[in-house]
Amino acid sequence: IPGRTGRARAAVSVPPPAGEQVPTERLEPRVEERAGGYWVLKEKYRAGLNPQEKVKLEKEPMALFMEGGIQDLARVPMEQIDAAKLTKDDVDVRLKWLGLFHRRKHQYGRFMMRLKLPNGVTTSEQTRYLASVIEAYGADGCADVTTRQNWQIRGVTLPDVPAILDGLRAVGLTSLQSGMDNVRNPVGNPLAGVDPHEIVDTRPYTNLLSSYVTNNSQGNPTITNLPRKWNVCVIGSHDLYEHPHINDLAYMPAVKDGEFGFNLLVGGFISPKRWAEALPLDAWVAGDDVVPVCKAILEAYRDLGSRGNRQKTRMMWLIDELGMEVFRSEVEKRMPNGVLERAAPEDLVDKRWERRDYLGVHPQKQEGLSYVGLHVPVGRLQAADMFELARLADEYGTGELRLTVEQNIVLPNVSNERLDALLAEPLLQEQRLSPRPSMLLRGLVACTGNQFCGQAIIETKARALQVAREVEKRVAVPRPVRMHWTGCPNSCGQVQVADIGFMGCLTKDSDGKIVEAADIFVGGRVGSDSHLADVYRKSVPCKDLVPIVADLLVERFGAVPREREEDEE
């Protein structure tokens, strides 16, 4: 972590401007600490709660981890679990605090397990272990790279969970607090420490944040009863690979009075009913205070956030209700010394920077070494792929892999003398994990879709690949175009940040038949000129998408129609 390079400074806070009035009673914390360190909603605030809050009140979710409940639950047959509401809610809701998501609708009795992987950094040993877990489940087992630089593994059965958790601990991993109303995986620069142009190495900060959030994988019940999920990122590059504008808290590197630290953005999020870009908190913290300010913001959100309508419980709704200055004041009084400094005049991100493509071969800051970005088609991997990736990381690098928010993988620290041998490896030659994908495939992102997810309305991963490949037969695309797919309005595929986005829905076709369809979004941008996409067309049947997308690429993105053979349809 960069040291303090400036003079010693007294912490000074500027009083908030007058005019924003919030009733005193509204600022009373709505939660209180109970035995075991758990934070519970006060009795007088329990009217009008959403169903998820009622489940949390009925039984503390973290008890499944901190009090050994998972070991007992894993011994109970699913049929017996379903016979009682309490244990059924354990399986369908509370296990999400352990990163376990029951796929009741599509894979009854099987779970998706989401990990914590700060900055997307993983090792060959960890990758092999995860591969061994999904391999045991045969056709039901696979892994996905997520849009938060993370692993999700599929096919897990409940009786296996205690042993899997032990295996994760043995290789330095955890799945704790990775679902529901918790802090999600801390995102950082996927090229941290190897990027010749990085502003700061984000890994120390994301590791600190993750250690705080999970209490070093022991469980941190002080922040496990948030009103809703909460996303955080640390910016380390001019490219803004970390997507600060859609995070609840984004640390923007900035120098104030000669001292390195971060300006703060807050409130960015995507949801079914609303999506909003993060706004300046008008606050700066020194590099040493990354965790204290995160803690203060989380506690303000935990204490004051609404727990009624689930669609209005993300942190930005609280900021809107209180006003930014009052929200800032609530954060400030939860800081260790009761002071939160005003922002530096500007951050260190170059607003004229053209975002770089990390796929392919690129020189590192370390002489004689390169990193190789590999495209993972819609983020889906099988056990054999992961075993091979682990081997490549050991044989050509330093046993390390980096996951990206675009669902791809970076292999760092490859000696330049070994690049040709790496690029000749069958896994890369077969186009399975290509360093040189086509213009449309390289920017393709897709959520899980209805193959596994009960909330998804349409199938996404196979369809995303099919549409991209069919469109490429019709038009030549001169530059990468980021196309994102999400199976439902929850937008796990982040369609609002895409050049072209597809959000799953249902509609009637020309024959009056209900068919899978998509709302099309256009105009999302990432980088310093970030902008969330707007709806372009609603309820387009999926079978009609290819010509529409091809025309859109010609009209908006400089694509050129290809010549067709006479016998081509």
Swiss-Prot record:
Its EC number is 1.7.7.1. Residues 1-28 are annotated as: Disordered. It holds the Pfam family NIR_SIR_ferr. [4Fe-4S] cluster binds at C447, C453, C488, C492. It catalyses: 6 oxidized [2Fe-2S]-[ferredoxin] + NH4(+) + 2 H2O = nitrite + 6 reduced [2Fe-2S]-[ferredoxin] + 8 H(+). This is Ferredoxin--nitrite reductase, chloroplastic. Keywords: 4Fe-4S, Chloroplast, Electron transport, Heme, Iron, Iron-sulfur, Metal-binding, Nitrate assimilation, Oxidoreductase, Plastid, Transit peptide, Transport. Its main location: plastid. Siroheme binds at C492. Induction: By nitrate. The keyword RNA-binding does not apply. It is found in: Plastid, Chloroplast. GO terms for molecular function: 4 iron, 4 sulfur cluster binding; ferredoxin-nitrite reductase activity; heme binding; metal ion binding. The gene is NIR. Binds 1 siroheme per subunit. GO terms for cellular component: chloroplast. Monomer. Pathway: Nitrogen metabolism; nitrate reduction (assimilation). InterPro entries: NIR_SIR_4Fe-4S, NiRdtase/SiRdtase_haem-b_fer, Nit/Sulf_reduc_fer-like_dom_sf, NO2/SO3_Rdtase_4Fe4S_dom, NO2/SO3_Rdtase_4Fe4S_sf, NO2/SO3_Rdtase_FeS/sirohaem_BS. SUPFAM superfamilies: Nitrite and sulphite reductase 4Fe-4S domain-like, Nitrite/Sulfite reductase N-terminal domain-like. It comes from the Eukaryota. Belongs to the nitrite and sulfite reductase 4Fe-4S domain family. Residues 1-4 form a transit peptide. GO terms for biological process: nitrate assimilation.
